[in-house]
Amino acid sequence: MTLLKWALLFFVISVVAGILGFTGVSAASADIARILFYIFLVIFLVLLILGLTIFRV
């Protein structure tokens, strides 16, 4: 769950930087948040599939 929290933190940084006019920081933070979110999503889907197939009792 920590990875998702980091993604949300970088999203908030991106929004605040965008509001304040720091477009370079905003774009970089948005890219980091997007990458972390997709990593979290892939890990979640892999564990979901493993939980439904291999680790079934």
Curated annotation (Swiss-Prot):
<dbReference type="Pfam" id="PF07043">
    <property type="entry name" value="DUF1328"/>
</dbReference>
<keyword id="KW-0472">Membrane</keyword>
<keyword id="KW-0812">Transmembrane</keyword>
<keyword id="KW-1003">Cell membrane</keyword>
<dbReference type="InterPro" id="IPR009760">
    <property type="entry name" value="DUF1328"/>
</dbReference>
<protein>
    <recommendedName>
        <fullName>UPF0391 membrane protein BRADO2787</fullName>
    </recommendedName>
</protein>
<feature type="transmembrane region" description="Helical">
    <location>
        <begin position="6"/>
        <end position="26"/>
    </location>
</feature>
<dbReference type="GO" id="GO:0005886">
    <property type="term" value="C:plasma membrane"/>
</dbReference>
<feature type="transmembrane region" description="Helical">
    <location>
        <begin position="35"/>
        <end position="55"/>
    </location>
</feature>
<comment type="similarity">
    <text>Belongs to the UPF0391 family.</text>
</comment>
<keyword id="KW-1133">Transmembrane helix</keyword>
